[in-house]
Every structure is written in C-alpha cells, then in structure tokens.
Amino acid sequence: MAPKAEKKPAAKKPAEEEPATEKVEKAPAGKKPKAEKRLPAGKSKEGGEGKKGKKKAKKSVETYKIYIFKVLKQVHPDIGISSKAMSIMNSFINDIFEKLAAESAKLARYNKKPTITSREIQTSVRLVLPGELAKHAVSEGTKAVTKFTSS
C-alpha cells in the first residue's frame, strides 16, 4: 500500500494543474469569455511585425467636397457651407455622374460600340441636363477636353 500512496500524489499533481488552468480560463457566470485575437498564418505575437506600432490605414472615401468648396470660394468668397449642405451637394454630384454614365453606356450599346468616348458623354449631357445648363456643360467639357489633348 505504501507504494500506491506515493504514486497518488505524483498522479494528482498533473491533475491538479489542469483544473487550475481551467479555472483561470473560465469566465465568471453570466459573462461571455473573451475571444482571443487570431493572427494571420506565419505571424506570431513575438514576431517583428506587431500591430502595436502601426495604425490601421483608413479606407479612403472619394468625395467632391474639396472641389465643391473651391468652386464656392470662386463664386462667393465670403460664404461658407454647412456639412449637411456639403453632403447633399456631394450626393447630387454622384447622382448626376451616375445618370450620365448610365446614359453614355446606353448610347454606346445602341450604336454597338465597346468604348464610351467624349461624343457619348456629350450626347448624354444633352439628354440628361436641361436646356441652358446642358449648353454650358457641353462648352466647359469641350474646353476641358481641348486643354487635356493639347498638353
């Protein structure tokens, strides 16, 4: 019996260590356990590439806000614009460009051409924008294309 008594404490030591680690890992009742952060394959916590020093790069969102502001300052230098009004103007420009792109795509499809050229854009501007606004847009667009091709 004496040898069995000596084996029991030796066998209990690993058994005692397991519940101790389980107690540490278990969260109190009513709380969810914290999920561990998973690292990408090949990266470790001790590795040279840690996330502590680097900030996550923001996803760039393209807007027309700076251009709207520049035009506003050219037309009315003393007037400002609220963020809500700027957001509305940005949505308006996105909507107009979307309509022009859709109309240009339709025109290219009707004419069985794979490419949208300045001619399709010009025609779509005439179709989408009303009267005087279309005339001004076409003249400004023609001027911009001429400037681009000459440089």
From Swiss-Prot:
A GO cellular-component term linked to this record: nucleus
Cross-link (Glycyl lysine isopeptide (Lys-Gly) (interchain with G-Cter in ubiquitin)): K147
Entry-linked InterPro entries: Histone-fold (IPR009072), Histone_H2A/H2B/H3 (IPR007125), Histone_H2B (IPR000558), HISTONE_H2B_site (IPR055333)
Keywords, ordered alphabetically: Acetylation, Chromosome, DNA-binding, Isopeptide bond, Nucleosome core, Nucleus, Ubl conjugation
CDD domains: HFD_H2B
PTM per Swiss-Prot/TrEMBL: Can be acetylated to form H2BK6ac and H2BK33ac. Monoubiquitinated to form H2BK143ub1; may give a specific tag for epigenetic transcriptional activation.
Subunit structure: The nucleosome is a histone octamer containing two molecules each of H2A, H2B, H3 and H4 assembled in one H3-H4 heterotetramer and two H2A-H2B heterodimers. The octamer wraps approximately 147 bp of DNA.
Function: Core component of nucleosome. Nucleosomes wrap and compact DNA into chromatin, limiting DNA accessibility to the cellular machineries which require DNA as a template. Histones thereby play a central role in transcription regulation, DNA repair, DNA replication and chromosomal stability. DNA accessibility is regulated via a complex set of post-translational modifications of histones, also called histone code, and nucleosome remodeling.
Listed name of the protein: Histone H2B.1
